[in-house]
Design a protein with these regions (language model features):
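A conserved donor-nucleotide-binding helix/loop in the catalytic core
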Residues: 56-67, 94-124
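Conserved donor-nucleotide/metal-binding helix-loop-beta segment in metal-dependent transferases, i.e.
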Residues: 133-160
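Acidic metal-phosphate-binding loop of nucleotide-sugar-dependent transferases
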Residues: 128-129
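Catalytic core and acceptor-binding pocket of nucleotide-sugar-dependent glycosyltransferases
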Residues: 161-249
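N-terminal anchoring/stem segment of glycosyltransferases
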Residues: 37-98, 220, 242-257, 261-270
Length: 276
């Protein structure tokens, strides 16, 4: 009989980790893995729909605030690509439409068709700033009705601005569909679902997708005042959770100074060439 050799290795269980892969291996088709070994990720993607020639000044600080305070999986740029900023992922396509809202609408189709974007995602503008950590279940925001908002614009100027006219159009189309007219068009992040957003914007041609989507899908919401500050003198409260600005108030106003002081450290997205 051949001689037998037996080798005994004394290995502490903790040292086994050095023999294991440090990152998940790719999943190969044909192998079944129990779902309990692959917990579903709850983080959702953040979408920024950007025009091609966007000034990145506000966006830089919006991204810093997102990285600091808004849990997410990936940040996507759709459409434009500002120099010096590198997102986690990008959808590059030719935006179509006669105004910025129609351009955004065309980009939303691309987002909803993209298999790599999470099923539920947050839509951000480049002038949205998350001032406090976001925790708990998300509920979208709204402020009154579209009729209220259009009447406010009309009181300020009977000749409605292009933006006000798009809100009026959204209200009329939603009424014709038998839907509500809640004003979801506030300057705050909004949660969308890829499947239902396509169905919603196909039913209504208004470019104001927030109110179209919210009313057609009857999205739950919290009613609150819009957070946009457009003047140069308003100083936000330290406890504010979200802020929004325009180019002038961000560059020259107290609100812009407040935001820049809150987020002095560069984000992971500021790693390209030509920033600033």
């Amino acid at each position: 009989m051949a001689n037998e050799f037996r080798i005994t290795l004394n290995i502490h269980p903790d040292s086994l980790t050095s023999f294991l892969p440090q990152s998940p291996a790719p999943i190969t088709r044909g192998f079944c893995i129990e779902e309990k070994t692959m917990p579903k990720r709850t983080e959702k993607d953040i979408i920024y729909i950007l025009k091609q020639d966007i000034d990145p000044f506000e966006l830089i600080y919006s991204l810093r605030s997102v990285e600091a305070n808004f849990p997410h999986r990936k940040v996507w740029f759709v459409g434009g690509q500002p120099r010096g900023l590198v997102p986690d992922a990008r959808i590059e396509h030719r935006q179509t439409g006669s105004n910025k809202w129609e351009l955004i609408r065309s980009s939303m189709y691309e987002v909803a068709r993209n298999e790599d974007v999470t099923s539920d995602f947050f839509l951000f503008n480049d002038d949205f700033f998350v001032m406090q950590p976001v925790k708990g279940k998300w509920i979208n925001f709204a402020s009154g009705t579209l009729t209220d908002r259009v009447n406010q614009f009309a009181a300020e100027n009977p000749w409605l601005s292009p933006y006000a006219r798009t809100l009026f159009k959204a209200r009329e189309e939603l009424k014709s569909l038998g839907c509500g007219e809640v004003n979801y068009d506030v300057h705050l992040p909004m949660l969308f679902n890829k499947d239902t957003v396509i169905q919603a914007i196909r039913q209504c041609s208004s470019p104001q997708m927030r109110s179209v989507y919210g009313n057609i899908t009857k999205s739950p919401y919290k009613d609150r005042k819009d957070v946009k500050i457009g003047d140069l003198t308003t100083i936000p409260l330290e406890s504010c959770d979200f802020l929004s600005t325009n180019e002038t108030s961000f560059k020259d106003g107290k609100v812009g100074e407040f935001i820049r002081e809150r987020f002095p450290a560069p984000s992971r997205f500021e790693r390209g060439e030509g920033l600033g």
